[in-house]
Amino acid sequence: MVLPLEILQNLLMGFSPIANLAQRYHSTGLNADLAKACRVFELYAGFRSVVGMDILEIGPGQTLEVLEKALASGAKSCTAIDVAAYCSVGQAAEKRISYHIYDGRRLPLEAGQFDLIWSHTAFEHLRYPAVTVGECFRVLRPGGTLVSSIDLGDHSMYGKTRVSPEQLFDSLRYPKWLWDLMKWNRSSYTNRLRKSEWMALFHNAGFVVLQAESQISKDIASVLPALTYLHRFSYDDAVTSVVTVCLEKPQSPALASS
């Protein structure tokens, strides 16, 4: 990365007119690809049936097709929330989806409103992950489920040519203050939390982990001895590229601490 250029781009993205213009060209995960949306829905539905459920999806970007599939499969209601308006409230309403924008902190939703919360490759972009995880716990009903797939890679490397597979976690080379100075205002920002840090956040919020599935980067594992910037992490944290979790809000608060 050319650090001065990265910092300048980040500063420019702090101006609303420029950010709004750039938003038109954002790639947000599924990008309304119906086939991909169906696969993500099947992933979610494999953890818990959607029939009769009130569902919230966090960070859908341009893709409301996953929630449309949920409604077609028997969900009672579907709500989407994001930090940027990738579609309008009216467009979502036509699909029978309630659409909200939030500030990345408090969810403008009632406590105990949902049975299911979904998120696909969005949590890694959270600027305030501990706050949002706590908010997920608040808006879930007791016995409710959170399913999230979190991509732990450096998103600024995605889509580039001549990128080595060993650069998957290149973002971890930089101290937090410098990373934030380069990326905070940009869609390629990631919070760089590792698997164990996510699991700690979920536990501290009160969730019970029902399932946790990890994908390992074989490329990183094969060259790990040479990647000294990763040596401060445990082996699991150093090589895990994706973690998918299924979490439950306990029926009784006492169960969360057991």
Labelled PLM ranges:
Residues 52-62, 145-175:
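Conserved class I S-adenosyl-L-methionine
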Residues 65-105:
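Class I SAM-dependent methyltransferase SAM/SAH-binding core
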Residues 92-94, 99, 196-204, 208-258:
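A C-terminal cap/extension of S-adenosyl-L-methionine-dependent methyltransferases
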Residues 105-117:
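A short acidic, Gly/Pro-enriched loop at the edge of an enzyme's catalytic core
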Residues 115-128:
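A short SAM/SAH-binding and catalytic strip from SAM-dependent methyltransferases
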Residues 130-145:
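A short glycine-rich, Lys/Arg-flanked "PGG" loop and its adjoining helix->strand segment in the class I
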Residues 180-196:
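Acceptor-substrate binding/catalytic loop of class I
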